[in-house]
């Protein structure tokens, strides 16, 4: 196994996670009620970690002829191992941001170390559910310190964390590794080994003359459809801007995360349901 090749690909994948983290950090600072201190704790730490670890792995292999040394075994190892750091980075905002019991909650008299450990497991589950578009959630009154009796548990979370939750599903819908292919196929050439490891369904012969061209086209379509759905939900379904953005992100990926405990039922709108059904297909 050529571990420097695997490390290079993992480094690129990890660095890509920093971009959506920067988006939610900016949202938290300027539009969310939690402010700068919360943004630094929940997002800046994983953002710096993603950038530093990713850059370190890429730098270790710099100068090596990665393209000619990339074989199927390195590609399969990269895809399999790539999910681990991606999910860990995705879990940190939940754990550090207080969706589940984390280090910040240790100052509470009723919180034990075992609660913080359970919070880490819950955060991992929520992140994995998002990136794999499973749609299961463990955010409830028993697991989240932000939920109070009689409150809507999910909507009680900071908006930036709800947005991060939706972004994990949107990225997972197309495949976070596929996003890496878009860059790596240009940087390395010969991204077909990675494609064989990540993609299922259509044969590679039908993916088009260039993997990079195919990946760019798929992501362009994905982004355009997301924007169209968001606008339809906002102006035809008369959904609020924040809700329309989140449901567009999670519907197109067929993930199912919502912005409240009741999900779509909270809107009680046939127009919204029709729009969502169309884009879920």
Language-model features: where?
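Membrane-proximal intracellular helices of multi-pass ion channels
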Residues: 1-281
């Amino acid at each position: 196994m050529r571990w420097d090749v695997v490390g290079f690909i993992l480094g690129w994948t990890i660095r890509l996670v920093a971009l959506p983290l920067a988006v939610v950090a900016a949202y938290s600072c300027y539009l969310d009620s939690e402010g700068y201190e919360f943004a630094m704790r929940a997002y800046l730490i994983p953002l710096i970690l993603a950038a530093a670890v990713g850059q370190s792995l890429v730098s270790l292999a710099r100068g090596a002829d990665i393209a000619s040394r990339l074989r199927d075994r390195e590609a399969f190892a990269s895809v399999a191992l790539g999910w681990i750091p991606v999910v860990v980075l995705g879990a940190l905002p939940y754990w550090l941001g207080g969706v589940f019991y984390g280090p910040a909650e240790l100052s509470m008299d009723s919180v034990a170390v075992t609660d913080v450990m359970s919070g880490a497991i819950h955060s991992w589950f929520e992140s994995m559910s998002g990136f794999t578009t499973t749609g299961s959630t463990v955010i409830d009154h028993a697991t989240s310190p932000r939920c109070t009796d009689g409150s809507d548990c999910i909507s009680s979370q900071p908006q930036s964390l709800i947005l991060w939750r939706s972004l994990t599903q949107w990225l997972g819908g197309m495949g976070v590794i596929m996003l890496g292919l878009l860059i790596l196929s240009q940087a390395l050439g010969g991204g077909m080994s990675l494609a064989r490891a990540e993609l299922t369904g259509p044969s590679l012969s039908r993916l088009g003359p260039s993997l990079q061209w195919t990946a760019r086209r798929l992501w362009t379509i994905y982004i355009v459809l997301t924007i169209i759905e968001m606008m339809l939900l906002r102006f035809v379904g008369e959904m609020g801007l924040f809700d329309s953005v989140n449901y567009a992100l999670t519907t197109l990926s067929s993930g199912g995360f919502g912005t409240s405990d009741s999900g779509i039922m909270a809107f009680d709108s046939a127009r919204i349901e029709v729009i969502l059904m169309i884009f879920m297909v």
